[in-house]
């Protein structure tokens, strides 16, 4: 069973799927109001206990067994992460990794010492030869660790943690 979990401003949403011959089949989906609708999910300021209980209740309500989840995918909200598309020179993957760290510090407004940086190559640039389009993503280690801790305390093992604005794209690649 593959499970997607979205911790939103008003609802916690979950969808469970099984892989079938031609793709995926949704086997269950549900949502639950957040513990306190006046308190948006902020990893630095939340009362973890209430959020853990809400996630556990949603999983129980949907009759999902955390032990049967093969892959858990979840996202960090756009307000807790930065996303930027850039164009850069095409280069070997080893060089690209260090170049992306440099580019992220240049383009994404975050303290580089506390940032977790990732990137995804979109493909060749249509307008410039020998250049590629890349999406840079960054969040703080604190945000990422809070998200992982929340999932672990809820009895879930995170497999994929994405950034909400690009999660849907990555779900199908």
Language-model-derived ranges and their functions:
Residues 1-33, 70-75, 173:
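Gly/Thr-rich phosphate-binding beta-strand-loop-beta motif of the actin/hexokinase/Hsp70
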Residues 10, 48-52, 56, 97, ...:
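Amphipathic alpha-helical transducer elements in NTP-driven molecular machines
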Residues 19-21, 59-66, 108-112, 172:
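Conserved NTP-handling cores and scaffolds of large molecular machines
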Residues 20, 32-38, 123, 164-166:
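Short, solvent-exposed coil/turn elements at secondary-structure transition points
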Residues 24, 40-42, 81-85:
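Switch/connector loops and helix/strand junctions flanking conserved nucleotide-binding motifs
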Residues 29-62:
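N-terminal phosphate-binding loop and adjacent alpha-helix
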Residues 55-71, 154:
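Phosphate/pyrophosphate-binding loops at sites that engage ATP/ADP/AMP, CoA/4′-phosphopantetheine
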Residues 71, 75-173:
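Active-site neighborhood for divalent-cation/phosphate handling
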């Amino acid at each position: 069973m593959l499970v997607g979990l979205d911790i939103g401003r008003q609802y916690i949403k979950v969808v469970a799927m099984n892989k079938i011959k031609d793709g995926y089949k949704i086997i269950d989906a549900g949502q639950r109001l957040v513990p306190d609708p006046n308190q948006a999910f902020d990893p630095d300021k939340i009362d973890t206990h209430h959020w853990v209980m809400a996630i556990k209740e949603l999983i129980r309500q949907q009759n999902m067994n955390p032990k049967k989840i093969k892959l858990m995918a979840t996202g960090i909200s756009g307000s807790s992460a930065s996303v930027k598309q850039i164009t850069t020179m095409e280069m070997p993957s080893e060089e690209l990794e260090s170049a992306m760290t440099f580019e992220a510090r240049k383009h994404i407004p975050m303290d580089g010492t506390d940032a977790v940086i990732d990137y995804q190559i979109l493909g060749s640039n249509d307008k410039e030869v020998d250049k590629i389009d890349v999406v840079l993503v960054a969040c703080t280690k604190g945000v990422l660790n809070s998200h992982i801790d929340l999932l672990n305390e809820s009895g879930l093992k995170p497999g994929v943690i994405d950034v909400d604005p690009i999660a849907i794209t990555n779900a199908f690649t």
